[in-house]
């Protein structure tokens, strides 16, 4: 039995966690449904070769990330030894194959474009926040793509908010009665997610979609502070390889970032933030940041972006010097 099938107990428990941790009830509820889907995915990953990525992945695997993310993004491996039909079947099942009571696939909204499928699952939300609602209340979006290389991949253990903030007695109840426990899932490495977000931010900046842009700018700021991303900038070969994966993906993606624009020239690095973006950045944090101590200022974000751009410029300079050295030495 799923926890949400016992509506009274489910609703009451979410209210307990809400009061204890001061986290909006609609966020706790949606996080539960997101994790329920991800747990089903984790059971099938060896076959599906579908890996968790994006902002929700970062939010679930990093203790330092406290921005709630409500969509599920998946990268589905293209296996060259398999037929096109076999690869397409795995892609479809990754987005459309979840049979969970209380989650209804909205077939009319489903989008199937080339190597990308976006599915929408409805659930009956018990908590409607009229003043500051989620971007997609009562709905989970799953986007599965099979553009290019999915790697690099690593394994992480994740858990829903209701388990994370439960006490020992409550965790025992969740585990024994509803099988709600931490579980392992294969995730794209945060280095790849970081590069993806550099490009996603540019896409939303160009389209003036400031709420989505604000989420990526927040994530980039937090990710940049981690030891792994700091080390990532010191590994030129790995950095170039992952950027190349992303460049190839953007070619296949409808409306992707122009291949001729260098990362250091992305518009959001040099833009003067207008009132619409500043308003969106505040609204994003008002709803999606769990606690006040995890809020950041736009100045902190701009400082981090300047440092990111400077590091990318330095990498380009090192690469150019290496090319010049090889030419002088007659190397290929």
What are the functions of these language-model segments?
Residues 1-50, 62-66, 77-332:
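Structured mid-to-C-terminal alpha-helical surface segments
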